[in-house]
Structure formats: C-alpha cells, structure tokens
C-alpha cells in the first residue's frame, strides 16, 4: 500500500511540499529504482496564483491543481494531478520511476489543464481574461527536473508570465457617474514555445515570434483591472491599453521603453480626463511569493 505525505515547513523555507513515499522502501531494497514511488518535493509554498496576487497572496485556493508528467526519451511516461482542497494536497494516479537507469524528465504545470507534455511545449495565451476565473487560468507556473532516478529530489516552481495591473481614475467633472468598460491590455505575442535545456537542467522560454493580441482584462476591487501577458518588449509611444467610457473609445500609450520579465507584476496608474489620457508606471514587483520571514502570516 502506498501512502501520500504532505510536509509543511514554514520555519525552514516557507514551502508547502508534497512528498510521495513507498511503504515498502527500506535499506535492503534493490539498487534499481524502477517502479518505485518517487519521493519528490514541489516548492509550491512560495508561489501564488495570480487571482490571489490581486489581493495579498500567501495562499493557494480550494480546487487548485498541478499536472505532473514524467517521461524519458524512450518512454512517453505517465501523468498525475496534485489537488489542493484548501488545507492539504493529494494526488491521483501513479508517480513512479519508469526505469532505473535512464535520465527522466519531470514537468509540473499550473494550471492543470495546460496541454504541456513530452510532445507539446507550446503555451497559447488565453485572451479572454475578463473574469477572475479566466485570469487565473491564463497564468502559467512550471516546475522542471531532469536527471537519473534518485531517492529524493526537489522541484522548484517558477512563474512564466507577466501580470499587468492598472489603477485608474476617471475625472468626475468630465465624466460624471461614468466608469471604464471593456478594458484591454496589449500582449506582444499570443503564444510562445518552451524547450528543455537538459544540460543546464532548465525549462526555458524561447523568444516569442507569434502574433500580438489584445487581452480582455479583468476588472476587480475598486478602480482596477488586470491581465496576464506573455513577456515582451514595449516601445515608447506604443499603444498599450484600450478601453471605453460610455460609447467613447480611448487608448493609452507607453511612456518609456519597457521590457516585461517572467514572473513580475507591472503596476500602472491611468488618469483619464476630457483632454488627457496619462499612463504612469507605479511599481515593478517580483512575484516569487512569500518566505520564512513572514511565516506567522501563513499559519
């Protein structure tokens, strides 16, 4: 009988980890690990999904899932799903070494319905992010490991997209009792390919070459909207936002050259008046999540 263990360590690294062990493992086991349950730690505790990031982050949500694939060059392998119920993680399906000698690839992906696997490493941006659910599902977090089978391994997770948050103000004298509608954010690309750099043990994003896309943003809180875009370069004067007030169309341009990076949030202030539309960058934040320095907030 196999067991599933969840280890929670705030004091050491602030990680929520899922370890999978076999009851039959002991010091007298055969040298080969073929068929043995994999004892893996996924560092998801320092990560947060983007809907949580709209607030203060610091937690995964009920029904969040990670899809984990394991394969080799000669074996298509198998897939399991890690599910969170608001308190603990569990898994479905087998998670075992395919053989005891070949280099294995383990690829963990959020959201779990992302069609990543051995034969498909292309990410297509979801352009309708007008609801919080759609915004969350447009996120992309990956974990990658490549090596020969071993008893214990750690798989770090990494945000791959860029988050744009707009804090806006509409002049009440110019537009009384009116609000922004149909906000859109410009993504320089609508898809991107990834590749396995096995020599360096990295899962890397190639330079995107796909067509640009307008992303329907999610309005949230009071006077804010957000969207996830594929990292890319923006030039001064390039139209970055589109929106409406009443039946009138507006756009806002970048005021400086900006390079969006993986796993960062770019926050802007948008001021709209009768004769002005001004976009000003407020901050750039690294969305690695939290660490052990504030574990008291997580308990």
Language model region names:
Residues 2-10, 19-299:
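Sec-type signal peptide cleavage vicinity
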């Amino acid at each position: 009988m196999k067991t599933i263990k969840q280890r929670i360590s705030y004091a050491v690294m602030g990680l929520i980890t899922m370890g999978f062990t076999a009851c039959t493992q002991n010091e007298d086991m055969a040298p080969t690990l073929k068929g043995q349950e994999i004892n893996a730690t996924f560092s998801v505790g320092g990560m947060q999904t983007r809907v949580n990031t709209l607030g203060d982050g610091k937690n995964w949500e009920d029904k969040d899932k990670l899809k984990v694939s394991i394969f080799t060059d000669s074996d298509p392998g198998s897939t399991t799903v890690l599910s969170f119920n608001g308190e603990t993680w569990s898994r479905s399906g087998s998670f075992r070494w395919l053989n005891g000698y070949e280099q294995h690839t383990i690829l963990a992906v959020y959201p779990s319905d992302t069609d990543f696997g051995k034969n498909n490493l292309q990410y297509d941006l979801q352009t309708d992010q007008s609801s919080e659910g759609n915004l969350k599902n447009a996120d992309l977090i990956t974990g990658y490991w490549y090596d020969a089978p071993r008893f214990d391994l750690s798989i770090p997770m990494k945000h791959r997209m860029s988050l744009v948050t707009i804090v806006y103000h509409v002049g009440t004298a110019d537009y009384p009792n009116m609000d922004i509608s149909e906000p859109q954010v410009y993504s320089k690309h609508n898809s991107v390919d990834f590749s396995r750099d096995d020599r360096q043990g990295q899962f890397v994003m190639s330079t995107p070459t796909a067509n640009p896309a307008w992303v329907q943003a999610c309005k949230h809180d009071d006077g804010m909207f957000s969207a996830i875009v594929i990292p890319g370069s923006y030039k001064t004067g390039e139209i970055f936002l589109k929106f409406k007030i009443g039946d009138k169309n507006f756009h806002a341009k970048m005021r400086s050259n900006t390079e969006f990076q993986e796993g960062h949030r770019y926050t802007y202030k948008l001021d709209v008046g009768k004769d002005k539309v001004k976009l000003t960058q407020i901050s750039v934040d690294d969305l690695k999540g939290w660490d052990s320095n504030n574990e008291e907030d997580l308990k």
